Amino acid sequence: MERTFVILKPNAVRRGLVGEILKRFEQRGIKIVGLKFLKMTREQAEKLYEPHKGKQFYDELLEFMLSGPIVAVILEAPRCLELVRHIVGATDPLKAEAGSIRGEFALTVTKNLIHASDSTDNFIRESSIFFSPSEIIDYYLDVQDDI
């Protein structure tokens, strides 16, 4: 099994889309093994987006991520990283596939509802900002045999 990390951004929370987004993952057989509702600290935001420091959009992105609560999630499934990125859609909502989360609901590149890790290394780095190993729960889905 493979894992990945996503953050439902402040606009996903404010627009009442948390349940809809999580449902899309669960309907595909993706298991939620970590889930937190929180207000991101500046330190967490700076660590998360450290690779983008110095880029034109960095300050705006940080301020947006600090503007309200977020939902941090660790997901698990076979080929999880690839599957989640397909469900999420392209970063730019105008380039996102119809039916993807961003293609259906996102407004702008910054306010695109969801952050998703783009590699296993980034999953490890990003998820460790929000979760300790003891906060990741392993369990068996009733439908797991069908996946």
UniProtKB/Swiss-Prot annotation:
Subcellular localization: Cytoplasm
Give one Pfam hit by family name: NDK
Q: What is this protein called?
A: Nucleoside diphosphate kinase
Active-site residues annotated for this sequence: H115 (pros-phosphohistidine intermediate)
Q: Broadest EC class?
A: transferase
Taxonomic lineage is: Bacteria, Thermotogati, Thermotogota, Thermotogae, Thermotogales
PANTHER family assigned: NUCLEOSIDE DIPHOSPHATE KINASE (PTHR11349)
Q: Which family does it belong to?
A: Belongs to the NDK family.
